[in-house]
Amino acid sequence: MKPARFAPRAARKGNPATGLAAYRLGLRAETLAVLLLRLKGYRVVARRLKTPAGEIDLVVRRGRALAVVEVKARGEGDAAAEALLPRQQRRLERAAAHLLGRYPHFADLDLRFDVVLIVPRRWPRHLADAWRP
């Protein structure tokens, strides 16, 4: 039996229950990240933006800053902080290039890459300007 097209990628690879749980965890983590960023004065430009290079979790803006945000949810703080590998950073950089190509009015803004770490029983951590390409 073929998995549904809307099923999360993890569900298509293996156990559907595990994949669905991971998908829901990701949605909850992104919702918490949106709340945190709104409280800090950011405006959400896009959520789960799909580009040929990959998906961007959040695109937010505050003033002249445009941030491509990767949301990481893990069971422990250190695991969340270490979850963004250099390969994923390059993928996000390519996705951001597609974003700027598709929406040229963003090209005048200061682009940066942020990470929001979501860990159970702790406040979410926003790492502004987490890395530079």
UniProtKB/Swiss-Prot annotation:
Disulfide bonds: none annotated. Coiled coil: none annotated. GO terms for molecular function: nucleic acid binding. It comes from the Bacteria. InterPro entries: Restrct_endonuc-II-like, tRNA_endonuc-like_dom_sf, UPF0102_YraN-like. Pfam families: UPF0102 (PF02021). SUPFAM superfamilies: Restriction endonuclease-like. PANTHER family: UPF0102 PROTEIN YRAN. Belongs to the UPF0102 family. This is UPF0102 protein Plav_3586. It comes from Parvibaculum lavamentivorans (strain DS-1 / DSM 13023 / NCIMB 13966). The lineage of its organism: Bacteria, Pseudomonadati, Pseudomonadota, Alphaproteobacteria, Hyphomicrobiales.
